[in-house]
């Protein structure tokens, strides 16, 4: 799937970086917000547009760790190191120097939200921070949705559609 560099999901990365500024104190440098609807439409916002662009162009959503049908997920936190498709985790690390991540997953009736937090390869101890501060991460998710509500509303008007995989 090819998106124009002007598509909001790619052009909003600077705005996303501003929204995650409070995370800088913890050296969290990577954040994504994905909202996957049961009808197959999706929102994908990220601080790293080059990663999202490559992910879509390579059609990695066909095997992605958060790209199965939204009904298959539970409300939970999941470390990148525990995800089923480690090939994508390694690709993110090797090609974009992003690792040591965690997903906060929130399920509702018509969609599932995925908030990912990550950092660079030189910060493996961040995983301890995640595990000991899940409440902080949950509060940041709420903060992001409130502070980014206008961005999310704009994204709602440009949702992508692609098939969910069944793995």
Predicted regions mapped to residue ranges:
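Juxtadomain coupling helices with adjacent low-complexity linkers
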Residues: 1-16, 120-167
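Short glycine-/small-residue motifs
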Residues: 113-116
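Structured interaction and signal-relay segments at domain junctions
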Residues: 3-10, 18-96
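Glycine-rich loops and low-complexity Gly/Arg-rich segments
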Residues: 56-61, 69-71, 102-106, 127-130, ...
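Helix-to-coil/beta transition segments that act as allosteric "coupling" elements at the rims
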Residues: 87-111
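Short, flexible beta-strand-to-coil junctions
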Residues: 35-39, 107-108, 118-121
């Amino acid at each position: 799937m090819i998106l124009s560099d002007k598509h909001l999901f790619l052009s909003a990365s600077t705005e996303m970086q501003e929204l995650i500024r409070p995370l800088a104190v913890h050296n969290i440098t990577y954040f994504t917000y994905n909202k996957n609807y049961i009808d197959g439409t999706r929102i994908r916002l990220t601080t790293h547009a080059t990663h999202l662009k490559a992910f879509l162009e390579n059609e990695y959503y066909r095997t992605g760790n958060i790209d199965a049908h939204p009904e298959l997920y539970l409300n939970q936190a999941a470390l990148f190191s525990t995800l089923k498709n480690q090939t994508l985790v390694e690709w993110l690390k090797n090609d974009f120097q992003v690792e040591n991540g965690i997903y906060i997953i929130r399920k509702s009736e018509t969609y599932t939200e995925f908030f990912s937090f990550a950092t660079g390869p030189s910060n493996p101890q961040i995983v301890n921070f995640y595990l000991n501060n899940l409440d902080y991460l949950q509060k940041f998710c709420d903060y992001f949705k409130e502070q980014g509500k206008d961005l999310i509303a704009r994204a709602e008007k440009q949702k992508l559609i692609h098939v969910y995989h069944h793995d």
